[in-house]
């Protein structure tokens, strides 16, 4: 589907299934609200899937790999050649998210949506829009047409996952320089100062961080992206990986597949998606708060409370994978626990 068709296909959650899930929680033999945010997430999953007892056993990670021309400004500790190396590791099932996914029975689909050099792996899906973005310090990151194309590739990935029968998705990314692009996107969408939303990424020095902030400030002043137009923001200061994730989240909502969000880059893409279609936020589950400074601001903008605050900032979808593990743990008692009636005990009642 096109972006417009996808947005028009997104419908509200199933209130009947959510009510049934809340009633089940009220009757199984545990304290009211005992599973906290995980309990809320299970109710949300019920509404997305239309299942009072949600089945998320078929799960996949879609990881978008892309390079960013702004790396030329010295905003990263390592060179962009690392993107291709890690993408090829994903093709071999050897990256961090692949090894975590293996423990969760989760399939991983790495996608080359814009790596600077061709990827030497048949296991990496080839959907390259261009060989890395332009340096947004001097020119727009990509054309508006390329931004839209990348979003629609993400939609296509969600449709592929629906056809394969997956009932839960996580989105990941790999791209040197993408904490710079995500900070620029966050600043553009919310008007927050670059210094507030920009972090050290993969270990920048203080001098490097100051340079990174200055580059983002200058790019925003140069391009003036429209905060009310997600495609314009992507076109001017975004990344192809972020665009792909944005499309994945919209496509998953249209297919009624829940998505577990990862860290700051994932949440920047999620905010772009929500600006395009506010209803899509209801299909997103927040896994963790990243160690990047923009993370809590993005989660607040999305109205999300994450399960985990573990200081993670690895990317690839690893924080989302950790969130899936917690969902599995919470679903076990939800599915199998006896009710208060079964054990002859009066159910807990809400107290004023």
Model region roles, listed by residue range:
Residues 2-352:
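N-terminal loops that bind phosphate or other acidic moieties
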């Amino acid at each position: 589907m096109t972006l417009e068709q996808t947005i028009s296909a997104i419908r509200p959650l199933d209130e009947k299934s959510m009510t049934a899930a809340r009633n089940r929680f009220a009757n199984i033999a545990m304290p009211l609200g005992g599973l906290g945010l995980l309990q809320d997430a299970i109710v949300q999953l019920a509404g997305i899937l239309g299942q009072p007892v949600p089945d998320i056993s078929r799960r996949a990670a879609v990881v978008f790999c892309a390079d960013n021309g702004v790396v030329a400004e010295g905003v990263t500790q390592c060179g962009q050649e690392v993107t291709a190396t890690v993408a090829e590791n994903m093709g071999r099932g050897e990256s961090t998210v692949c090894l975590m996914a293996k423990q969760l029975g989760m399939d991983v689909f790495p996608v080359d949506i814009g790596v600077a050099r061709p990827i030497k792996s048949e296991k990496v899906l080839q959907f390259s829009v261009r060989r890395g973005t332009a340096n947004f310090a001097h020119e727009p990151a990509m054309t508006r047409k390329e931004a839209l194309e990348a979003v629609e590739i993400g939609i296509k990935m969600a449709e592929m996952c629906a056809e394969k029968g997956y009932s839960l998705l996580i989105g990941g990314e790999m791209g040197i320089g993408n904490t710079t692009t995500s900070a620029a996107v966050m600043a553009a969408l919310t008007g927050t100062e670059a210094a507030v939303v920009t972090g050290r990424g993969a270990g920048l020095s203080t001098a490097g961080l100051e340079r990174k902030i200055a580059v983002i400030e200058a790019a925003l002043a140069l391009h003036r992206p429209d905060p009310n137009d997600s495609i314009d923001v992507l076109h001017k200061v975004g990344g192809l990986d972020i665009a792909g994730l944005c499309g994945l989240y919209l496509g998953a909502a249209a297919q009624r597949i829940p998505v577990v969000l990862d860290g700051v880059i994932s949440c920047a893409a999620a905010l772009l998606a929500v600006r395009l279609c506010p209803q899509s936020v209801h299909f997103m589950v927040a896994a963790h708060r990243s160690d990047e400074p923009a993370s809590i601001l993005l989660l607040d903008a999305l109205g999300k409370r994450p399960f985990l605050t573990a200081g993670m900032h690895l990317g690839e979808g690893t924080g989302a994978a950790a969130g899936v593990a917690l969902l599995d743990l919470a679903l076990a008692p939800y599915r199998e626990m006896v009710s208060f009636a079964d054990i002859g005990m009066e159910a807990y009642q809400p107290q004023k």
